[in-house]
Amino acid sequence: MASLIRLSSVWQRGMRPVLLCHTQLSRGSACPRIGDVDYTEPAGRIHTASSSTGISASQHWTGERVMTLVLLGMAPAAYLCPGPVVDYSIAAALTMHGHWGIGQVLTDYVHGEVKIKLAKVGIFLLSTATFFGLCYFNYNDVGLCKAVVMLWQK
């Protein structure tokens, strides 16, 4: 009842409730427009994981999201048609996804020039070892798809 009294007081003042409006609210964008960004700011203050690759941060972010969607699509593919192509694709996609994810954590929490360089070398070595380990497993054992099936069997 109190909410009805409150709504009636709002309507008396000439305002329409937001939920009953048929027009969309027009707010300012949370992101600046393309022409409003100052690209002359020193890059030392901006932490982007893609600074070494030469692509913009938005393209890098888009690539990460595409890779996440590809991984989601690989789950049914691995179940429906397991094989070497899917095994090696999953190995590559998991390695890239993990590399980018841990790289973002390192970007956020590792500070100092020497520590950042050591962290980048470490993540590169870890990602390389992960990829070659998964490829070794795919080549010399049953493969990732069949290994997951074996884990879920009784």
UniProtKB/Swiss-Prot annotation:
GO molecular function: heme binding; metal ion binding; ubiquinone binding
Keywords: Electron transport, Heme, Iron, Membrane, Metal-binding, Mitochondrion, Mitochondrion inner membrane, Transit peptide, Transmembrane, Transmembrane helix, Transport, Tricarboxylic acid cycle
InterPro entries membership: CybS (IPR007992), SQR/QFR_C/D (IPR034804)
Binding site for heme b: 97
GO terms for cellular component: mitochondrial inner membrane; respiratory chain complex II (succinate dehydrogenase)
Pathway: Carbohydrate metabolism; tricarboxylic acid cycle
Subcellular location: Mitochondrion inner membrane
Transit peptide listed as a keyword: yes
Function: Membrane-anchoring subunit of succinate dehydrogenase (SDH) that is involved in complex II of the mitochondrial electron transport chain and is responsible for transferring electrons from succinate to ubiquinone (coenzyme Q). SDH also oxidizes malate to the non-canonical enol form of oxaloacetate, enol-oxaloacetate. Enol-oxaloacetate, which is a potent inhibitor of the succinate dehydrogenase activity, is further isomerized into keto-oxaloacetate.
Subunit composition and interactions: Component of complex II composed of four subunits: the flavoprotein (FP) SDHA, iron-sulfur protein (IP) SDHB, and a cytochrome b560 composed of SDHC and SDHD.
PANTHER family: SUCCINATE DEHYDROGENASE (PTHR13337), SUCCINATE DEHYDROGENASE [UBIQUINONE] CYTOCHROME B SMALL SUBUNIT, MITOCHONDRIAL (PTHR13337:SF2)
Record's protein name: Succinate dehydrogenase [ubiquinone] cytochrome b small subunit A, mitochondrial
